Amino acid sequence: MFYLISYDISVDQRRLKIAKLLEGYGQRVLESVFECDLELPAYRQLRQKLNRLIKDEEGDRLRIYRLCASCREQIEIIGDGPPPETSQDIYII
C-alpha cells in the first residue's frame, strides 16, 4: 500500500529522528512529507516506531494518508524545485 506521511514537529532533535526513520521506509518529497510504498508488516513496524517518538503534549502532529492505486495515479506535481536536502552522511575517500 502507498502512504503519504506528513509531520509538524517543533523540537529539532525529535524532528530529525523522525525524518531519519522515515528515510528508511520511503522517499522524502517535500521538507516534511514522505511517500512510502509499504507492505502491511513494514507499515505496522513504522507506526510502532513513530508512536514512540511522537509527543502529543509538546504539540507534535503527524498525518498518514493511505492512497489506493487509482488515487496514486492521480497525483499531480506542480513545480520543479530542487529536492529537499537529506541528512545523509557523505564520505570522501
From Swiss-Prot:
**Which NCBIfam families does the record match to this protein?**
cas2
Keyword terms of this UniProt record: Antiviral defense, Endonuclease, Hydrolase, Magnesium, Metal-binding, Nuclease
Q: What does this gene product do?
A: CRISPR (clustered regularly interspaced short palindromic repeat), is an adaptive immune system that provides protection against mobile genetic elements (viruses, transposable elements and conjugative plasmids). CRISPR clusters contain sequences complementary to antecedent mobile elements and target invading nucleic acids. CRISPR clusters are transcribed and processed into CRISPR RNA (crRNA). Functions as a ssRNA-specific endoribonuclease. Involved in the integration of spacer DNA into the CRISPR cassette.
The reply on keyword Signal is: no
Per its UniProt record, what PANTHER family does this chain match? CRISPR-ASSOCIATED ENDORIBONUCLEASE CAS2 (PTHR34405), CRISPR-ASSOCIATED ENDORIBONUCLEASE CAS2 3 (PTHR34405:SF3)
Question: Any idea what this protein is called?
Answer: CRISPR-associated endoribonuclease Cas2 1
Top-rank taxon, per record: Bacteria
What the record says about family reads: Belongs to the CRISPR-associated endoribonuclease Cas2 protein family.
- The organism of origin for this protein: Chloroflexus aurantiacus (strain ATCC 29366 / DSM 635 / J-10-fl)
Residues annotated as binding Mg(2+):
D8
Q: How does it assemble?
A: Homodimer, forms a heterotetramer with a Cas1 homodimer.
